[in-house]
Regions:
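Trp/Gly-enriched beta-strand surface patches
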Residues: 1-76
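Short helix/loop capping segments that flank catalytic or ligand/cofactor-binding pockets
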Residues: 12-13, 27-29, 82-84, 91-96
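An acidic-aromatic substrate-binding cleft motif
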Residues: 104-131
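Terminal amphipathic helices with adjacent charged low-complexity linkers/tails
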Residues: 88-111
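A generic structural micro-environment signature
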Residues: 9, 42, 80, 92, ...
Length: 131
């Protein structure tokens, strides 16, 4: 997974953001100009159109973004399901643990677990009024 932190951020400077995937990641970059390219656009980034491997460039001071690239083989007549994991955590270790936990789960199971957790939180208090 690609982890990022902005210690200069006033509100969430201590948090760690992450971008991971359910499938192997082959290259990454945090340089927006590398991804979009000189003549590309956000709709048609040159790195995607050219099938280019990303450099792994992750440096402060650039125009930041988070890009992960993977080579995916889709069999003739087949399909492939891809999931990306985007979130934040208190520490890099917690971010890595979240990615590992969710990378191995089926997407439908993650949705069911998420709904169960929210139901446990939201259904705790019930209010009845005469109106």
């Amino acid at each position: 997974a690609l982890l990022a932190q902005n210690p200069y951020g006033l509100d969430f400077g201590e948090r760690v953001a992450f971008l991971g995937a359910s499938h192997p990641i082959h290259s990454v970059t945090a340089d927006r100009s590398e991804f979009i390219g000189r003549h590309g656009t956000t709709e048609y980034p040159q790195a995607v159109l050219g099938g280019l491997a990303l450099s792994g460039r992750i440096e402060a001071g650039d125009d930041p973004c988070a890009v992960v690239a993977s080579d995916i083989d889709i069999p003739a007549g087949g399909d492939v399901t891809l999931s990306w994991l985007l979130g934040d955590a208190a520490t890099p270790a917690e971010a890595s643990a979240l990615v590992q936990t969710h990378r191995g789960k089926d997407f439908d199971q993650r949705l069911a677990d998420n709904e169960k957790a929210w139901r446990g939180f939201l259904d705790t208090i019930q209010v009845e009024t005469p109106d």
